[in-house]
């Protein structure tokens, strides 16, 4: 089925074209215009042509005498045309500066001068094709909705056809605006026109509105801004106005009316204009200074407060705290080891936090202790555990206190032996356990006490005439190899022995000293050589391996820390 349109009455009716032009003008100025168009768009000529559109029925949903609803396929290739007039900006630099913020664009003197040129555009050769939903009712008029974009092509003729760039630009911009017009604005325009033709009430309302517009005077104040003046009014020069000056002003007076602005708003606008240098409203203004966008007073105060001399630096505070906590942890670890000798413990050291506390002399630092704890159960008396606890606490107290350089040397130090002692595995293996292995561990794990040679050199030069206690090699020999385990000692090893250390083995100054530094170094070397030879003779003795190799015993079991 096809429709036959009676197109001639639409062409002959002049009032219809006038009304359609007004509606198209309002629709074109409603949407946001591109910045190149600086004037209003006016429809000066509209002609629908002599060729009607073609409609193909796809679906009919409702059919009656006063109403109709259906879906159609529309195609139009006719001779309709439309003529528009407006004003455009011919200077592209002016258009660029208008669309950019002032603080991010240059400010030329004459190159940015606006140049407005009138423009006339004629749209013709429309080609439309799309699906239309058409609803007709005598009470509600015609409702037409496009399901897709119907515009295929059109021809744009303008004043700038001789300039290819401007012609192509206008072609693209107008096509984009017309696509929006067909989808959004054209259905509303057609609906209003249909109401004017078929609805008598709407027609009477339109006539009444036109009469009211004609009778309404066009001159006179529409809204008097002087009825409610601002709180702190100023004129265009910034001078504060009194209430009497405001009362004397009126819109009908012949005198020039001053522009009334609020002083607070002017200050805010001035601050906002000056703040374009730093993007902050509270940056102080300093001449001949390059501002940075992120330099604000709040950030400067916060950054300076961290490094102020009132509060100590963060790293030093952590170091002091870490040193205190490390001492407490070590003390608790020592007491825990003395109370629970059947479980392995670890000493946690605050390495990252105690860096500041380790900047002093090495004499203040406590030597790290390595202990091998027996995991096997053995009978322990309360007296033994008490003695171990007392020995550990005294050791920690004496080693944690910082000795002075002028203090006297200590002759006896009650200290828990640092040497790893392997307890007996069983009564049977106690008699067959080789003594050479334990003796070697004892001799290798013990070292000579350190000596402060630099302090002795200064002391020898300062006091060459005072007698010096000769270095006793027996002390060193006893220190290195005097502790020799026996089967009786392995069965009940002493937990807190008292060792006699010579005064020469400590790094403290002596009251009397004789001899030279060369003799002292020679004695130290001689003592070390004697101790090394004694250790080698004990290791290489033939009777030491007889017990181990003669009975064909199995291999030595792993240390108690790893074997179960």
From Swiss-Prot:
Any single Gene Ontology cellular-component annotation = ERMES complex
Low complexity bias: where? 383-394
Q: Which GO terms describe its molecular function?
A: lipid binding
Q: Where are the transmembrane segments?
A: none
Q: Does the keyword Transmembrane apply?
A: yes
Bias class Polar residues marks the residues at 297-322, 329-352, 396-408
This chain's protein is named Mitochondrial distribution and morphology protein 34-1
UniProt gene name: mdm34-1
